[in-house]
Amino acid sequence: MRRLLTFAVLVCALALPAGVAARPSGTTDGTLSVKDARGIITIQGRGGVIGSFAKGSVTINDPVDGDGTGPIVTGDDWSKDKSETATIWGGTKVRFRIIGGTFRVVVRGRGVNLSFVGKGGVILNGYGTDDDGSYAVNGGDYNLIPAFALPFALSATSP
């Protein structure tokens, strides 16, 4: 009986951390996918953004040092510090990401592709060309990016 009790305690001790690790994190997080956009995409939120653009610039404001990875940008032709917490990078074939914590990301350009997972405010504003790209929210269907500022809150319950 004692062996059975010891075995049961051991199984529970091993199963509990595995169950906690398997639990989905960020169940209130929403997702945004942007494909081949032309215009200005603004994200102010908490979570993670990974993206790239063919030509343009990205401004990343990371107001809290150490609450995530901080901005990581590659392929830029130039950069300029805007403030103590914000930097602008520009060029062609630029890739960027910021994972974790709060941030503000503003991408201006063409050939913009990005993914955002988290919660926050988003503004999509196309340049008014024939093809300003498309976006999808929370795994839904892709819609055309409008030629006017379209603000919305992103979370798991966003339409």
Per-region residue spans from a language model:
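Short, polar/proline-rich extracytoplasmic segments that appear immediately after membrane translocation
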Residues: R23-L32, T157-P159
